[in-house]
A protein has these predicted regions:
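N-terminal core-binding DNA-recognition domain of tyrosine site-specific recombinases/integrases
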Residues: 3-94, 99, 114, 136-141, ...
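Basic, Lys/Arg- and aromatic-enriched nucleic-acid-binding interface segment
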Residues: 58-72, 76-80, 91, 95-163, ...
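C-terminal catalytic core of tyrosine-transesterase DNA break-rejoin enzymes
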Residues: 91, 148, 152-159, 256-263, ...
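Conserved tyrosine-mediated DNA breakage-rejoining catalytic core shared by Y-recombinases
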Residues: 102-108, 162-230
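Active-site/catalytic core of tyrosine-dependent DNA strand-transfer enzymes
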Residues: 123-126, 143, 191-198, 216-271
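Short, polar N-cap/turn motifs at the start of nucleic acid-interacting alpha helices
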Residues: 167-175, 186, 272, 291-311
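Catalytic-site neighborhood detector that most strongly recognizes the C-terminal catalytic loop/helix
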Residues: 176-181, 193, 301-325
Length: 330
């Protein structure tokens, strides 16, 4: 009953995440209890076990490290699942109160320090781009243009895979400043792709208003996109497409992009790199430019806030970002 309501009210990706933890963890550990047995003590003991659970991770040098199996954010997701189920029981008068409300807030373990975000320095960017321009695996995975586009736009991997030719304006839109008027090439970030169990790859328009945005493109990225565009493409075709069963271009799975990255990253000494590293690199380049406000950075990233700025109007273009990023990609 609870998961049915979630599917009706929330995005498929959220429902899929809840279903994963419900089937894989909550039901195996709590499913045999009757509702009247799901008291504060039982639920608290369940979350205590999750907090203490550890996993062994092999490091790059072959050594092993004990790490937390269920991070604080994961446990918060699981708590939302249990709370939702118990709230349904309250609404149907199966129990008198929701025991999850009596639990202490979930915190990270004592002494735990979140690893600092890692972006690509100028030297690492040059090394990576030089390699993917020549490597057969990287070329076959279309990584050369895709990585430049990712670093130059800051899009999430699902957004990268969802960009269509109709979302690009390579001729540019007119932007008026105090000094002049110029044409700024842009990408309109209007959708995202992600896999949903039982449905395959699905498309949605973003979970929040800030996810829908217009991002200026650096000149180097624009030049490479123009070279890809032959003029006969269907506007609804993805820019970084995969071949569909009928031979026509279709959306690429984000997991396939990650797989291509794993095949090349060790070759350039970047074994820790993921597609999200490119987004962090974009954010780092923007953060290094003191002329951009926190509001501008948040707009470009498609986030509610960037650093301290939260309660301001949103949605401007900020064309100067393209200039900073173009210099960083050269």
């Amino acid at each position: 009953m609870w998961i049915t309501k979630i599917k009706e009210r929330r995005e498929d990706s959220t429902a899929d995440t809840y279903r994963h933890w419900l089937d894989g963890l909550v039901l195996p550990q709590l499913g045999e209890l009757r509702l009247d047995e799901c008291d504060v003590a039982q639920i608290d003991a369940f979350f205590a076990r999750l907090e203490k659970a550890r996993r062994t991770v092999e490091d790059d040098d072959g050594s092993t490290t004990e790490k937390v199996r269920y991070a604080a954010n994961t446990r918060r997701t699981i708590r939302a699942i249990v709370a939702g189920i118990m709230q349904q029981a309250v609404l149907h008068q199966a129990v008198a109160a929701n025991p999850v409300r009596e639990l202490e807030r979930i915190e990270s373990p004592k002494g735990h320090r979140k690893a600092p975000p890692r972006g690509l320095t100028a030297e690492k960017r040059r090394r990576l781009l030089t390699f993917v321009d020549a490597d057969k695996v990287a070329v076959g995975g279309d990584l050369s243009d895709l990585i430049r586009f990712a670093i130059g736009s800051g899009l999430r991997v699902g957004e990268l895979c969802a960009v269509r030719w109709m979302d690009l304006n390579l001729d540019g839109i007119p932007v008026v400043t105090d000094a002049d008027m110029r044409l700024v090439p842009v990408v309109a970030v209007r959708q995202n792709v992600y896999p949903v169990k039982g449905k395959g790859l699905t498309v949605h328009g973003g979970k929040t208003a800030s996810a829908l945005r217009i991002v200026p493109l650096p000149q180097m990225v624009t030049t490479r996109l123009r070279a890809r565009h032959h003029g006969d493409e269907n506007p609804e075709w993805p820019v970084f497409a995969a071949a569909g069963r009928d031979g026509r271009p279709t959306y690429r799975w984000p997991s396939n992009v990650r797989r291509s990255v794993r095949r090349v990253r060790d070759e350039v000494g970047l074994g820790w790199m993921t597609p999200h590293t490119w987004r962090r690199t974009y954010a780092t380049i923007l953060d290094d430019e003191l002329s951009l406000t926190d509001r501008a950075k948040a707009d470009l990233m498609g986030q509610v806030k960037f650093l301290k700025d939260t309660y301001v109007s949103r949605g401007e273009l900020h064309p100067d970002a393209a200039v900073f990023l173009d210099a960083a990609l050269r």
